[in-house]
């Protein structure tokens, strides 16, 4: 298991692995799924971490750099989705919450630009047949969604989408 986490100390995203210590592995997993302003930073080896997705939401270039020739990207947002710039009011919240972590604040503020640039790059790769993307065809659920019926319906959509796309995906992998 390789988790992407972001550290104030590292400034950039960082990939962490753990094969020996289950408690440390749990901390890495918690950090890689943390939500700014909602969950606290996770201390790993004395260093505070947030979700590395703040620095690189879809690490496609990392996958390519590692030499992966067949890449399947699973997105949680519909075709064409782009992140909006954070409002001034929310920027103030981030500045206050992470005033001791200016690099984290800068990373959070740049996130929409980096994300949107990555989505444009993914669109180009997909058009050229260089990657395979699975994405929902229905409205995605909120990150804070708690209603079991809504979550189950989105899960079912993903399950049936995968059933329909399996053959197409296998053709991509075999070419």
Each predicted region: which residue ranges?
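Non-catalytic peripheral regions of patatin-like phospholipases
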Residues: 8, 16-22, 53-175
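ATP/pyrophosphate-binding catalytic subdomain of soluble kinases
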Residues: 17-19, 27-65
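Single conserved hydrophobic/aromatic residue that forms the stacking wall/gate
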Residues: 1-6, 10-11
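Short Pro/Gly-enriched beta-strand edge/turn motifs at strand-loop
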Residues: 2, 22-24
